[in-house]
């Protein structure tokens, strides 16, 4: 088939090593009609996308999130791919090579997802043309979009950053792709939504296909496309006022717990639940929610209310734990809301109890909260103590960098109502936001030059006015001179800063502020993530504070991308990226016992940080490894007491000042990069793999196969008359039979690692048998720190590595609502051991059977159970109950790290 781009498009530059790697494998990725590439900021994903479009040789439709990105595609094609013939073609031919209007398509037509939606709906499309300046309007009434696509011969679709689209955009895109089924899809993103829900991820991969190739941050640092950098965390404890609110909440919970344990009416109501004595009649229903069932039984045990002993058995526990606030929360959720009709109690009593809990702050939106509520979590996320953290970080960085400091602080909100506090120290600025952060820096930072850049607000130091005006006139000689409105204190004295009214000139002012920031007239720039967190670049940034509450992988990586660009003016640039976390944990052992938690529950802020860091691949604090996750930041560890938090912060301040060490660690780690690859490693607690009946069964299968072969040889010798060999063969068989009888004792002494390694090989065998993995690759399994087993795929494509780790993780996942289970031992309903059939094998029984059969030599004979019929449903409920009671036993983890050939 003729390639329509021959002679018109040809890449003018030189492909970097990591780009060559992706392009070498691109043809293989295209086998299923989809290629999905993730590339860290700075990897040149746009030119990769253009090259892939060129290779398809067919007219293409490019879809982008915003107009500015839509235009960047066209500019990049003209600047990096247009040949002389293409330039002549554009001038003389009727059909253009490039277009941004689907009504008049070119060979390559670049539009936004919003335009696709409007064109599909046949309605007026109104979009901001970029950075809030003006709009672009097209009326698609009467326009036949699908007919135009067919007429233009468009057979390739390039999806740029196809994630977190508005729901109506998603629907339009899905409808379009359902109609145009034979399209070649090229999906490109810097930030795949790895942290999305399973349903969201399934929707995303159904559209884009599984990830085929990934260009990682370490590759870009090695090639000099990104600068060395390190992540740091600054912890704070709640302020006095916040601490008092937390203490009051916990005291309310403790008082309510004592009250409820002495409340005879609650005991009478609990005793009325018919399930306590009717196990057979209520088994299936109660097992739908094992947590609630456990809470009810634990409360009844504490109040000496009798119940069937079969309940603890089905939960897989020999003894119920003592009652605590945790279990009271489960019980009350059912009693008051989820299972209220099952209790014989006066409705007035129930309503009065609801009122008591609500007044104590222990219920929100029909949810019972004894450990922490949403209000407390939100307060901690927006803790005023983080303002003090920003000051301390700025002080550390200014001390270390001096005039070279170029710090960016990103927040969620402007908080323009605090402008009246600028220059008035008597006014409080304790709320997180652009203006409060700026004013705090102005008040406390003697000699710091701060500034603000937002969609509706620009604040500059008076010392930068002249430079700002010069930049404005340099960019646009016809522009009017900006107006500076000085901030003044109560006495009318100027405080050294002015507001510059934006008045529709945001694009111009953004460019000018960026320039004077890079020149040092502003050292600390404060802005919102919406304007500066994505699409805005200043290569001079060498320190970034993420004062945003956003925890998603996508936005977190977009914001980090601002700081790690190389700076041609500073070849030795090293960036620090700062994260803010507020910690609040019950410090007393007696508090934890009463609450029913073995270890302190960490704050939602901390879990947000964990989610962020799961999507970040970087060098560890000790410089020995490149991996993702919080584990590489070795100083961040328990106990998170106030004293230890202060110690962590002190260590962090010292580390952050030594940028040369960070550069050296990256250099050292990247020297070892040659011959290495990024491993997608799945890790599981070694306690999961105690040798047992299942493993003995597996070895038994292997021995029986050997015995069968020996029996065939023995019978063959008898038939052929080789009598001299018969006694030897007979003795061999007797020896192996005796060995088989005693193998149980032998195997029980073998290490759990043997079983884990066998399972890992079985998973790979199943994936190869089903045709999901076709390249030459091998499984590597090893024990880590004496606590974890890890496994990863060496060799193979990025997609295969990810698929292998996903499959193993799903096999060992807690039982919830999987379609198929593997069950071993016990009776028909209640097995001794369960494994989940991974999603990729669960779509049909024949696939699930492949998975089971390929695992037999490694884990023995397991029954395959379909959970969507009545019998399978019972097994699923029992398995789920067992998984809930033993949920800490199947601890799992996932990380990406650099592995060498000898590892």
Give the ranges of each region predicted by the language model.
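Post-DEXD/H (motif II) to motif III coupling segment of the RecA-like Helicase ATP-binding lobe
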Residues: 166-226
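Walker A/P-loop
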Residues: 31-52
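Conserved segment of the helicase C-terminal RecA-like domain
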Residues: 562-602
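Conserved C-terminal RecA-like helicase domain
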Residues: 40-43, 86-109, 143-144, 148, ...
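Conserved pre-motif I regulatory segment
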Residues: 1-38
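Conserved Walker A/P-loop ATP-binding site and its immediately adjacent core
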Residues: 46-82, 114-115, 169, 192-196, ...
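SF2 helicase catalytic motif II
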Residues: 115-116, 125-187
């Amino acid at each position: 088939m003729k390639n329509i781009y021959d002679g018109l498009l040809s890449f003018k530059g030189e492909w970097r090593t990591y780009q060559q790697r992706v392009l070498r494998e691109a043809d293989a990725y295209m086998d299923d009609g989809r290629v999905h590439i993730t590339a860290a900021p700075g990897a040149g994903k746009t030119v990769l996308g253009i090259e892939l479009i060129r290779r398809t040789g067919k007219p293409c439709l490019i879809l982008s999130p915003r107009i500015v990105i839509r235009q960047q595609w066209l500019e990049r094609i003209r600047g990096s791919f247009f040949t002389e013939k293409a330039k002549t073609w554009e001038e003389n031919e009727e059909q253009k090579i490039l277009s941004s209007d689907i009504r008049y398509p070119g060979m390559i037509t670049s539009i936004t997802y919003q335009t696709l939606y409007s064109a599909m709906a046949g309605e007026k499309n109104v979009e901001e043309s970029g950075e809030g300046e003006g709009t672009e309007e097209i009326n698609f009434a009467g326009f036949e979009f699908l007919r135009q696509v067919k007429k233009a011969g468009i057979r390739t679709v390039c999806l740029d950053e196809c994630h977190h689209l508005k729901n109506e955009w998603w629907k339009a895109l899905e409808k379009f792709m359902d109609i145009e089924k034979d399209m070649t899809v090229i999906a490109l993103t810097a930030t795949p939504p790895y942290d999305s829900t399973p349903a969201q991820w399934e929707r995303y991969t159904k559209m884009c296909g599984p990830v085929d190739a990934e260009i990682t941050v370490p590759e870009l640092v090695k090639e000099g496309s990104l600068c060395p950098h390190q992540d740091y965390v600054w912890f704070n404890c709640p302020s006095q006022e916040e601490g008092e609110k937390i203490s009051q909440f916990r005291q309310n919970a403790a008082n309510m717990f004592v009250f409820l344990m002495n409340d005879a009416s609650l005991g009478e109501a609990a005793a009325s639940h018919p399930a306590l004595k009717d196990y057979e009649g209520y088994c299936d229903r109660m097992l739908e929610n094992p947590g609630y069932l456990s809470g009810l039984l634990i409360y009844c045990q504490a109040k000496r209310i009798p119940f069937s002993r079969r309940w603890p058995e089905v939960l897989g526990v020999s003894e119920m734990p003592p009652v605590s606030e945790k279990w009271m929360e489960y019980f009350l959720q059912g009693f008051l809301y989820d299972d209220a009709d099952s209790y014989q109690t006066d409705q007035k009593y129930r309503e009065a109890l609801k009122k008591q809990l609500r007044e104590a702050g222990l219920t929100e939106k029909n949810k019972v909260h004894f450990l922490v509520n949403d209000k407390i979590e939100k307060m901690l996320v927006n803790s005023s103590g983080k303002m003090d953290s920003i000051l301390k970080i700025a002080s550390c960085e200014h001390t270390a960098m001096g005039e070279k400091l170029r710090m960016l602080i990103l927040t969620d909100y402007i908080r323009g109502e605090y402008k009246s506090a600028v220059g008035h120290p008597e006014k409080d600025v304790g709320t997180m936001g652009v203006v409060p952060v700026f004013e705090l820096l102005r008040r406390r930072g003697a000699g710091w030059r701060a500034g603000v850049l937002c969609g509706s607000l620009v604040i500059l130091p008076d010392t930068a006015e002249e430079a700002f005006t010069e930049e404005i006139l340099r960019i646009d000689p016809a522009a009017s001179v900006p107006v500076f409105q000085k901030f003044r204190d109560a006495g009318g004295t100027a405080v050294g800063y002015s507001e510059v009214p934006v008045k529709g000139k945001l694009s111009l002012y953004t460019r000018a502020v960026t320039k004077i920031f890079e020149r040092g007239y502003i050292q600390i720039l404060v802005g919102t993530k919406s304007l500066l967190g994505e699409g805005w670049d200043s290569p001079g940034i060498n320190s970034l504070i993420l004062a945003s509450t956003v925890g998603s992988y996508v936005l977190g990586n977009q914001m980090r991308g601002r700081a790690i660009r190389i700076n041609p003016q500073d070849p030795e640039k090293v960036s620090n990226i700062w994260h803010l976390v507020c910690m609040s944990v019950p410090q007393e052992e007696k508090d934890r016992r009463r609450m029913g938690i073995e270890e302190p529950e960490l704050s939602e802020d901390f879990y947000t940080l964990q989610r962020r860091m799961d999507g970040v691949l970087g060098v560890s604090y000790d410089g020995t490894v490149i991996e993702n996750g919080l584990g590489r930041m070795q100083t961040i560890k328990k106990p998170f007491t106030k004293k230890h938090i202060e110690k962590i912060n002190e260590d962090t301040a010292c580390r952050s000042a030594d940028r040369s060490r960070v550069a050296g660690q990256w250099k050292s780690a990247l020297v070892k990069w040659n011959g290495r690859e990024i491993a997608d490693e799945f890790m599981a607690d070694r306690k999961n793999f105690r040798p047992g009946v299942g493993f003995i069964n597996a070895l038994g299968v292997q021995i029986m196969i050997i015995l069968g072969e020996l029996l065939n040889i023995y019978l063959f010798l008898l038939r052929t008359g080789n009598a001299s060999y018969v006694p030897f063969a007979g003795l061999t068989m007797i020896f192996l039979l005796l060995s088989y009888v005693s193998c149980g004792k032998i195997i029980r002494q073998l290490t759990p690692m043997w079983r884990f390694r066998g399972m890992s090989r079985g998973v790979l065998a199943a994936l190869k048998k089903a045709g999901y993995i076709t390249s030459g690759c091998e499984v590597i399994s090893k024990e880590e720190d004496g606590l974890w087993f890890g496994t990863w795929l060496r060799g193979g494509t990025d997609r295969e590595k990810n698929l292998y780790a996903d499959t193993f993780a799903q096999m060992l996942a807690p039982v919830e609502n999987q379609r198929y289970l593997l069950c071993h031992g016990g009776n028909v309903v209640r097995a001794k051991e369960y494994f989940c059939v991974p999603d990729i094998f669960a779509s049909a029984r024949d696939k699930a059977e492949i998975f089971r059969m390929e695992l037999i030599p490694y884990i023995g004979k397991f029954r395959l159970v379909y959970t969507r019929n009545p019998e399978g449903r019972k097994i699923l409920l029992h398995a789920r109950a067992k998984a809930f009671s033993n949920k800490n036993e199947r601890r799992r983890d996932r990380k990406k790290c650099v592995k060498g050939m000898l590892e």
